[in-house]
């Protein structure tokens, strides 16, 4: 009897152990586990597709989502599967950087900061070219206003004003615009930071900040020069109002219809040809931070954040200067518009009674300014995603990088504001060019010539070159994704026997969401990528959702790539 009781107890313990096996294996994320989400439309099941083997006795149904192969996603993990909408089949994804044993996303964070600084550098470089071009335009206008219409006292008695208005006043060709941008900020070769981190991050980031600060100083200097030119032009505008005060043409003895004067090409400024292209941006090599990744990184990045904040202040100050300059030029345009009204002084055709004198006096085509063609495309934008700092968190690194990102965002906003100010300035200068082109067209000839129609044909400035233009497509749908939950794990499958591709299949619902078909078309020309992910990353947990390129990159870079070799799972 005692033996029977022992046997019963042994059998009971074995049954209990078997019942606990599934839960324990799921908890330990082993090769076998039980289904955790039977009621979900989005389930991922890994097993041998050919044999249809399953774990824990769960019944396979048509709504399960499964992948042939090993336990590459584990049990109960969330997996994001995305189908790229673009026809580009060569989308390259850069995985997270790893920094030794405890690693983390420090590299990705610094890379994002570097990319943002590069974008700001390109924007400011483009702005420098635009302001330089505007400076040349204003300088040309200053020259044309100072000499416009100075030959209005045409023709002595009997000469029928033959050379009247033939002055080429202000026919400056304008500036050629800014040159091409520099080669950008290049930060050395690969850095190695030893066993416990620290190293030259501060030097790299501070070098970038110093370069930006110098660039801001240069643009501020250009703004001061343009402001000075604006003041000079304003003085010229005040002194030009007395031009062409009536012609002293012939006494009536001249033959009718004589040469009449050409009317001049006064004010025919060609304007600036616009700025050159931006620089190549900031290149930061791979960083390795040793065993613990910590060290002096936080302090280094904090110093960089402080430097970038200083740049933000400089750019903000420069924005105010350019805005003030825009107002000054706008006011100058208004004053010039009224001062140029004396250019019709050639209409006093009281001489040469036998001719059709005065019929075309002052017929200048003033104000035909072409205006500026506008700036180029925008920069690549600022995208700051979630930072992960590994097992030990990296101390104050997160706060330091967050401060740096905030400062960079401030710079980006300031540059954006400055862009608007410079755009306003360009419009004002264009208006100024039109206003000043009518002054100096002193075609006071009293002959029958109708020439003089080319006065003031300013070409304006063509604007500077833009950045990479990435913002233009920032909000476009790049991929469609679904979230699934891994439920079952079965025996391994040699994916090399499957032409190197993991075999994937899915429920009808998922296929319809991804491909618009009851069957998943894994062999089409679009890339389908699966990565494990977390449900708390802000993306929907049920149903298909669209993502932009930057969001897709975030999902891929922050996901955990897994296949039987620990690499990315990719179809096609």
Swiss-Prot record:
Domain of life, source organism: Eukaryota
Compositionally skewed regions (Low complexity) per UniProt: 145-165, 231-240, 326-358, 433-452
GO molecular function: lysozyme activity
UniProtKB keywords: Signal
Signal peptide: 1-17
Any single biological process term in GO: defense response to Gram-negative bacterium
Comp. bias (Gly residues): 166-185, 258-282, 359-382, 453-469
Annotated region described as Disordered, given as residue ranges: 145-199, 231-297, 326-388, 433-469
Keyword Metal-binding listed: no
Assigned protein family: Belongs to the dictyostelium lysozyme family.
PANTHER family recorded: LYSOZYME-LIKE PROTEIN-RELATED, METHYL-ACCEPTING CHEMOTAXIS PROTEIN MCPB
Name recorded for this polypeptide: Putative lysozyme-like protein
UniProt source species: Dictyostelium discoideum
Gene symbol of the encoding locus: alyL
